[in-house]
Amino acid sequence: MSDTRRRVKVYTLNEDRQWDDRGTGHVSSTYVEELKGMSLLVRAESDGSLLLESKINPNTAYQKQQDTLIVWSEAENYDLALSFQEKAGCDEIWEKICQVQGKDPSVEVTQDLIDESEEERFEEMPETSHLIDLPACELSKLEEIADLVTSVLSSPIRREKLALALENEGYIKKLLQLFQACENLENTEGLHHLYEIIRGILFLNKATLFEVMFSDECIMDVVGCLEYDPALAQPKRHREFLTKTAKFKEVIPITDSELRQKIHQTYRVQYIQDIILPTPSVFEENFLSTLTSFIFFNKVEIVSMLQEDEKFLSEVFAQLTDEATDDDKRRELVNFFKEFCAFSQTLQPQNRDAFFKTLAKLGILPALEIVMGMDDLQVRSAATDIFSYLVEFSPSMVREFVMQEAQQSDDDVLLINVVIEQMICDTDPELGGAVQLMGLLRTLIDPENMLATTNKTEKSEFLNFFYNHCMHVLTAPLLTNTSEDKCEKDNMLGSNTTNTICPDNYQTAQLLALILELLTFCVEHHTYHIKNYIMNKDLLRRVLVLMNSKHTFLALCALRFMRRIIGLKDEFYNRYITKGNLFEPVINALLDNGTRYNLLNSAVIELFEFIRVEDIKSLTAHIVENFYKALESIEYVQTFKGLKTKYEQEKDRQNQKLNSVPSILRSNRFRRDAKALEEDEEMWFNEDDDEEGKAVITPVEKSKTEDDFPDSYEKFMETKKAKESEDKENLPKRASSGGFKFTFSHSPSATNGTNSTNSKSVVSQTTPASSNVASSKTTSLATSVTATKGNLVGLVDYPDDEEEDEEEESSPRKRPRLGS
């Protein structure tokens, strides 16, 4: 069947009560042997495949709506619809259905689903086929009419009969004439009755009645009737809003009068459904299903008509990107596209795909790049909404555009950088726009939705692009607010508080929390790229500065970032953390928190508990050797005692292993392992790295002679003990809380591996009896291995170095207290 009369779209209703487009084809009615009855067949116009094969069941309720729709249910939750291109085709198929069921084609519902008791009640009546007799349409009869309309809503058959009577007698237009009379006479009682009548007619759920009620001639009077809700002391002013406040603007003149009328109608009907009608109860939900379908098919038609008019869309894009276009006009154009994209969400996947491809072909992304950088907040907000539709539809399309753009533009004008800058510069105190943009960025950098083919790998290409061109823009606020210049300036001012660097501004803290959330996502999903970036920028150290923030949510974000890194159980990260002494700000935060049992306390404890349970040996050794004296007084959890136990067990195992190996073999093994690790780390850091800035942990330089490395464990321990005897001369200070306090100091030389006496953290302690000690010297707590001979700098944890560290004798210290 090739004629357009039988051309249809097949729809099914999904679980969300939205219509899914199953394809376009041609419908026919024929006898199907397998189904043993007359059936509706729809074959796809593209390849002739069978889209629908449905037997015309004598007991199925079919409905004809809007002259071109036939809707029915084949199972409890399986609704079908055929949308015809022409009314004639719909009428032909409707007659076939009615013929099979033995029904009159003039009736637009062939069956009613009623329960047995109601069916028995109607069977007892002598005549059930006659129409309901409507009272005369007069002012004096309004109460009677209202009672009639309200009474039929519980009966499907009576609803159908009333709808047919209203349609045949042109009753609705007569009622609306009475409405005008009641308003002129200020007849409040009559207006209240008309509200009940019109609301009840809407609940009849009849498409043919909607066509009358929502026509240009009637719709404003229908809205007027719905203003007079008896439950309200004063009537609403919906008509005033629709005629005066809500202005229809044609950004480009629409020459098609049918399209213009359809847009007006859809807006007003949507307003009735969303604003005027009360939220339906659970018993009324299905009463307005046809109204939902009416709006849905209107939107599909509007989008299709606009999409087919390429001249119209081309003109819109031309004006949107034209520098001569004034701001007001551009605002209208952007708002038009926002509404256009919102309407497109009613389309089914294949149609939506064609829609967005049309927009991409016309240049929607370059246009968005221009308008997102404008000063007008409303324009930027609308552009962000459009961008979100595009990212949701196809993140790959957006990624492809920005990578092509990078070959022709500077970093500052790249679309993704414009998006990041809009996120950073959001003026909303609650950062609503920034949160939305952060979600879009996360979608774009999510490897899970990146394509991988034999010819190219989108993941590799895009992540290289992002880290080379965009990451510095994203982290700029974080690095600025945790800069060492700020730290040094605050120290010069003599501030001894723990909040010298972190921003007190709530909005800035929120922004940094968003950035940290995105960086935490990168740690989980980007592996090599983010690892290289963290090492190069010493990013974790900068993030942990935020542990001092007065905003607990920001401190928790910083802690979560570190927790994700540790959760990877990657020894590169572990060495970076131990060599940088990066547990210090976390432990300081725990001690500063005192005895308060809150989220921060629990999160810090969980971090150390994870290390204990997962038995991460390098971190366990570092924590016990450097911080156990400060933590041993915390007895309300067994985490730290458990870490000490793990540490001692590992130490015993290493000692037993060491004692079982001859001295000469131990010496050779030390030398070989150090060299192997040294080469491995050099290879890793020499991989492709276009990032700016110096590596935080530089490759270990080859020693001039490997013989400079201690020949045995015993020789190295002599050096360590000599250092210990010097440290014992230093007296510890008292922290303000009465316990241990670590000062979080850092210098570039520390991160780059150069020897510095002040590059490590210090711990201070005193007792109440010695609180007025005149002076005290700082003492190093860090135990990174530093060779005393030659030029070898121990920036890498060699496996057997732990054995040496574990036998180090720490000077006795007093037990810290969490609060005094």
Curated annotation (Swiss-Prot):
InterPro entries: ARM-like (IPR011989), ARM-type_fold (IPR016024), EVH1_PP4R3 (IPR055236), P4R3-like_central_dom (IPR006887), PH-like_dom_sf (IPR011993), PP4R3-like (IPR051137). One of its GO terms (biological process) is regulation of double-strand break repair. Residues 1-100 form the WH1 domain. GO terms for cellular component: centrosome; chromatin; cytoplasm; nuclear speck; nucleus; protein phosphatase 4 complex. Its main location: cytoplasm. Coiled coil: none annotated. It is found in: Cytoplasm; Cytoplasm, Cytoskeleton, Microtubule organizing center, Centrosome; Nucleus. Residues 744-789 have a biased composition (Polar residues). Residues 798-809 have a biased composition (Acidic residues). GO terms for molecular function: protein phosphatase regulator activity. Keywords: Cytoplasm, Cytoskeleton, Nucleus, Phosphoprotein. Residues 687-820 are annotated as: Disordered. It comes from the Eukaryota. The modification Phosphoserine is found at S117, S663, S811. Residues 701-732 have a biased composition (Basic and acidic residues). The keyword Transcription does not apply. Belongs to the SMEK family. Serine/threonine-protein phosphatase 4 (PP4) occurs in different assemblies of the catalytic and one or more regulatory subunits. Component of the PP4 complex PPP4C-PPP4R2-PPP4R3B. Regulatory subunit of serine/threonine-protein phosphatase 4 (PP4). May regulate the activity of PPP4C at centrosomal microtubule organizing centers. This is Serine/threonine-protein phosphatase 4 regulatory subunit 3B. The gene is Ppp4r3b.
